[in-house]
Amino acid sequence: MEILAFAIYFVLMLGIGVWFFFKGKDETGEQEYFLGGRSMGPWVTAMSAQASDMSAWLLMGLPGSMLAFGLGKAWIGIGLGIGTILNWLITAKRLRKLSKAANDSITLPQYLTNRFAAKNPALKIVCAIVFLISFTIYVASAFSAGTKVFTSLFPALDPTFAMIIFAAIILIYTFLGGYKAVCWTDFFQGLLMLVALLSIPLFSVVIITRVSAVLDSSMITQTVIGADGTAYNFVTSFFSADPKDIISGLAWGLGYFGMPHILVRFMSIEKPSMVKKSSIVAIIWVILSLVSVVLVAYFGRILVLRNGQS
């Protein structure tokens, strides 16, 4: 069943790339390839932005962190939620208008150069270096997460081979279909992520079978020994978190204003007037997803206790 599910998923991703390859044969030019001709609708813009942002860390990193260290780590999710909302409300519409006005810029380095009338390539070079270093780490972590999913479902699969498959599929649909293929694959991935995150807490309640067990008071007082050897109260650590940990968690949201893979979505939406609808979709998505992740960690901890683990 797992093999069939992955096969269908990969065929869908590659199919999107092939579709836009043939559909876009008559649509030439850099703007078409890198921004989809600035023709993306509000739903695709919203879902692709959120899926490309909250990928492996949302499904694995954040719930795993809360499961291991307590709900005090939920402050990271709150910071990211606030950052997402502010990014859509403050940056999105302005960037769409200004990138068009700045000589119809199609990349962020080009936009910054045109916006500030830079006479030398220094700004572009600095941007390129920052992007190269940051995205090498970011993409490596995404590939690592994808590989872990593969190998957890198929233990006999060599991790290196799994990573090659994962990377090859992404490269194929990206080179074939360009920006539109990337956005549409992210759109479907965003839907899949939301359905999964909403479903897991519901199935967890069914597995636990009793509401009284779900609200078991022992969860309030349970102590978790983190990977660093520190003792955490699983639930109340959210309220008793150290101020510096709260500030650190909330500060994660500041990164949104400089994430190229999100900002480029703002630049590609068809009309500035569509940003409002797109922002509503994105904000609802991120709130539902982050709340669901907290529930996943909470129910996961209950199931761990039921199995006699710590």
Show the residue positions of the predicted features.
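Short helix-coil transition sites and intra-membrane helix breaks within transmembrane domains
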Residues: 22-25, 52-56, 99-103, 135-143, ...
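Loop-to-helix junctions at membrane interfaces in multi-pass transport proteins
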Residues: 37-39, 44, 61-62, 67-78, ...
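Central hydrophobic cores of alpha-helical transmembrane segments in multi-pass inner-membrane proteins
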Residues: 8-19, 52-61, 81-94, 167-175, ...
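Hydrophobic alpha-helical transmembrane segments
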Residues: 15-34, 72-77, 106-111, 136-139, ...
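Helix-loop-helix junctions that connect adjacent transmembrane helices in secondary transporters/permeases
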Residues: 67-176, 265-310
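Membrane-interface "cap" regions at the ends of multi-pass membrane proteins
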Residues: 1-60, 174-177, 202
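Alpha-helical transmembrane segments
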Residues: 1-13, 73-87, 242-251
